[in-house]
């Protein structure tokens, strides 16, 4: 069995991971559909709270990332809620919204359904060695609601290792320019 690109690299912070992975995609990325891609990429951030992308070519917006995070925390899939928080609705969300102006791939809406966060907390409190503390975001029963946007994140698993909370995020797809920069901030 050959597993391509399964190198698990340790980075100091999100910006270092961004710069490294962007370079890897540009050099080693395979043509796939209308983009370049790397499959089966995994990495660890030593300091996950250092989650600002400072690469000047990217011009990442902390203000927008904070607004998107607040939108997710609200659990409201309405793009109007994001507009209320951020002051405007970014065109990408207008494009991805359904006829009710909702985005069902909204992570907050997904993880709040079925009280998944409470479930994870209870599992970890009951057994700090559990492997069942996981949140499911992508749900095959909801294919029809993903008509314009399928969640990039499949699931998030929480474990306690060395008395610290670890989080592993499994992604279906994550573009380096927009998806990675904002998703890593949320997680």
Positions of predicted regions on the chain:
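Terminal, non-catalytic protein-protein interaction segments that mediate quaternary/complex assembly
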Residues: 1-187
């Amino acid at each position: 069995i050959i597993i391509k690109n399964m190198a698990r690299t340790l980075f100091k912070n999100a910006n270092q991971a961004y710069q490294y992975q962007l370079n890897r995609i540009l050099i080693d990325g395979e043509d796939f559909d209308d983009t370049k891609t790397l499959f089966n990429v995994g990495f660890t951030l030593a300091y996950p709270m250092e989650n600002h992308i400072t690469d000047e070519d990217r011009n990442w917006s902390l203000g927008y990332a904070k607004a998107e995070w607040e939108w997710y925390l609200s659990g409201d899939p309405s793009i109007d809620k994001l507009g209320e928080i951020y002051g405007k609705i970014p065109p990408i969300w207008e494009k991805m919204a359904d006829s009710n102006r909702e985005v069902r791939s909204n992570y907050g809406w997904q993880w709040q359904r079925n009280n998944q966060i409470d479930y994870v907390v209870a599992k970890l409190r009951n057994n700090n060695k559990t492997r069942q503390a996981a949140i499911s975001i992508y749900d095959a029963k909801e294919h029809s609601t993903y008509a314009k946007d399928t969640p990039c994140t499949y699931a998030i698993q929480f474990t306690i290792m060395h008395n610290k909370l670890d989080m592993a995020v499994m992604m279906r797809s994550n573009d380096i320019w927009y998806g990675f920069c904002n998703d890593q901030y949320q997680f």
